[in-house]
Amino acid sequence: LYAVGCKARVLEIWTDVPGMMTSNPKVVPTARTISHISYKAALELSHFGAKVIYPPTIQPVVAEGIPIYVKNTFGPEAHGTLIEKNPPRSKDSVIGISNSDNIALLSLEGSGMVGIPGFSSRLFETLSQNDINIILITQASSVHTMCIAVSEKDAEKAREAADKCFAYEISLGKLNPLKVEKGFSIVCLVGDDV
């Protein structure tokens, strides 16, 4: 916010890492620093686990088109990462790999979903009213199954809320009770053409 309010030419974020990395160096020892990256790719990496930037706090800077430099406090001479609207195009299709652990998959299934509008919006509204963030959504082409990913800590609350919301359809056998599976991770490939 200060960078926007001051009409800064650049925002510098000083941290304990050399910049945004191609992957988590604790998991992948050969991870490299990304020298240039677009706002979009940086936000995607951070959404799925890269902790160098926090999307809500940099949204005003992104909206104003202010470049962001991520630099290392312990190695200030290093280039770091420049996050900007139109960075030089990378020779690699995949710029980075990010992940989120402790994910639960919630599956809403049943023949009663086919051809009936509104199931998705009802589920999303119910989860929203219960302060449950949806991380990922997928729906089978048959429209018979919808699967969403949430944090494991929200899984049981989501099950209770969804089963209550769809109690009538479940009682008629048109839908199955929400199926919860835990112990998953999401791996995200980020790149200009990915």
Can you say where each PLM-predicted feature lies in the sequence?
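C-terminal catalytic "cap/lid" subdomain
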Residues: 1-194
